[in-house]
């Protein structure tokens, strides 16, 4: 067993020990205000007392993506890293169709945010993954025909993301593929329950089906 693997395993175990327990989550939920919640987070090892939540969360995201990239041997973790790209793609596409300025991006995944932005604005999408190309083209076509809907855009990007992740799982192995398949199934159940509670018809649920 290589020392590199042992080091990586130790890093993961260290982070696992810092995960929020059910009691810690309840403590945050019970906080009277943002100040008290910030103090609780600091005591749990996340940020410093009084630090802005967005700063704490953004730093944690950046650290996690950096760790995944550091440990990404042969692209085995690409399926996990690329999720950050789809968060950014969704932000950029929503800004593109609304004419607003895109802000508050997730950390760069396999692609730079600027690369995604330039591809959307210029139409030069050949350097992107096929799933990304397809969802960009579909969004642009919907925009041209006046058929863009925020919910539909969310669903289109989510479908592209999971299709891409399942494809990348060829480099990750069986366990990763099973993980993403379970996530997809949980999302289907969540979508069905949401549609049921809101009294929406089957068509709405079917459109969300990944």
Task: Give the predicted meaning of each segment.
Residues 1-210:
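N-terminal domain-start signal
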């Amino acid at each position: 067993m290589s020392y590199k693997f042992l080091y990586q395993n130790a890093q993961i175990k260290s982070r696992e020990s810092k995960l929020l327990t059910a009691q810690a989550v309840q403590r945050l939920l019970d906080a009277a205000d943002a100040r008290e919640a910030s103090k609780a987070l600091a005591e749990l090892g996340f940020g410093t007392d009084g630090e802005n939540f967005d700063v704490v969360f953004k730093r944690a995201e950046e650290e996690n993506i950096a760790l995944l990239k550091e440990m990404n041997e042969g692209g085995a973790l690409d399926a996990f890293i690329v999720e950050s790209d789809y968060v950014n793609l969704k932000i950029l596409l929503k800004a593109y169709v609304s004419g607003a300025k895109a802000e508050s991006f997730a950390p760069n995944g396999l692609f730079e945010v600027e690369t995604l932005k330039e591809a959307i604005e210029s139409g030069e999408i050949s350097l992107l993954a096929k799933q990304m190309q397809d969802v960009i083209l579909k969004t642009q076509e919907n925009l041209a025909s006046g058929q863009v809907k925020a919910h539909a855009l969310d669903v289109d990007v989510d479908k592209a993301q999971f299709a891409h992740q399942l494809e990348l799982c060829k480099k990750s192995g069986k366990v990763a593929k099973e993980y993403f398949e379970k996530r997809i199934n949980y999302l289907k159940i969540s979508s069905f329950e949401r549609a049921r509670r809101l009294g929406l018809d089957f068509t709405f649920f079917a459109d969300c089906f990944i």
